[in-house]
Amino acid sequence: MAGMKSSPSQDEEACVLAIQLATSTVLPMILKSAIELDILNTISKAGPGNYLSPSDLASKLLMSNPHAPIMLERILRVLATYKVLGCKRSELSNGEVEWLYCWTPVCKFLSNNEDGASIAPLLLVHQDKVPMKSWYHLTDAVLDGGTAFNKAYGMNIFDYASQDPQFNKVFNRSMAGHSTITMKKIVETYNGFEGLKSIVDVGGGSGATLNMIISKYPTIKGINFDLPHVVGDSPIHPGVEHVGGDMFASVPKGDAIFLKWIFHSWSDEDCLRILKNCYEALADNKKVIVAEFIIPEVPGGSDDATKSVVHLDAIMLAYVPGGKERTEKEFESLATRAGFKSFRKVCCAFNTWIMEFSK
């Protein structure tokens, strides 16, 4: 283009990146197959530092296709390129070279941990045919207004999930795995639950989050607050009372109110309605504990944390009317506008930030 000059080496690098971006659907779809084939769990079970060949893997997975080892090799190569797996060269007795593959820290989070939780279901839900269809409507949403998912299905993703049992199962499994991993880290890292007599989890679903908190702090009374049809099917947890209601109408009283990944699904106006109800439910000097992703003020960051939250913001753009990830300043503004006297960013757990809004 006129006025834009670059060196041959810069052109080489830029064109290679453009080609990588043009083929970027490869990685999530390869990961999807690796998860469905149980490749990552199988390699993780071998343990750190223990390597498997494609033939070993095909044998462990009981694959009858004679071409499976060759096909697995090509899948494993992609995963090793993105550091999902480690690899090393091995020379066979006949002089041929074989590549062996092993566990990495990234693989740890994409395979089942000791609690049976994994980030893998989160990947599967975003590659599922249901939400994938919405991306084909994003251009129209930008041009005409509205949300891509609603244009694809005539309703929002939450209403759709309630009508599609199979997708609802995939969706709930993805949220449960991500939540379990993140909450375990929050409970280990954040000490703001200490000394509380009671805590209300707004939008707490089945009560699993409160159960993790109260397992560490058994003297706290937990109130799991969600829509009546949600809490009506929730399991019994020691120290947890299930309460049905609408967070846009009122919120139960407690020493603290906890909201995890709630605000990114709502517009600023809706967030303010929720926060004002939380404010009314708290005594003076009590707090709302917010767990959310924080998007950087300045675009263009290339670190993994920034890429992750920018991806999530784009997902909100496509799936949820009014939903978005927010900057620290935007959270502070919401707290101030809702009447809270102080805002504090406390700590981070796997890119989810804990913030306190104090009355």
Swiss-Prot record:
Keyword line: Methyltransferase, S-adenosyl-L-methionine, Transferase
Activity control mechanisms: Inhibited by Cu(2+), Ni(2+) and Co(2+).
Pfam family, one: Methyltransf_2
Catalysis performed (reactions): a 5-hydroxyfurocoumarin + S-adenosyl-L-methionine = a 5-methoxyfurocoumarin + S-adenosyl-L-homocysteine + H(+); bergaptol + S-adenosyl-L-methionine = bergapten + S-adenosyl-L-homocysteine
GO MF entries: 5-hydroxyfuranocoumarin 5-O-methyltransferase activity; O-methyltransferase activity; protein dimerization activity
Residues where S-adenosyl-L-homocysteine binds: 179, 203, 226, 246, 260
Binding site for bergaptol: 126, 264
Catalytic residue list: 264
Record carries keyword Methyltransferase: yes
Domain of life: Eukaryota
GO BP term, example: methylation
EC code: 2.1.1.69
Induction: Constitutively expressed.
PANTHER family from the UniProt entry: O-METHYLTRANSFERASE
Family: Belongs to the class I-like SAM-binding methyltransferase superfamily. Cation-independent O-methyltransferase family. COMT subfamily.
Protein name, per record: Bergaptol O-methyltransferase
Native source organism of the sequence: Glehnia littoralis (Beach silvertop)
Protein's gene: BMT
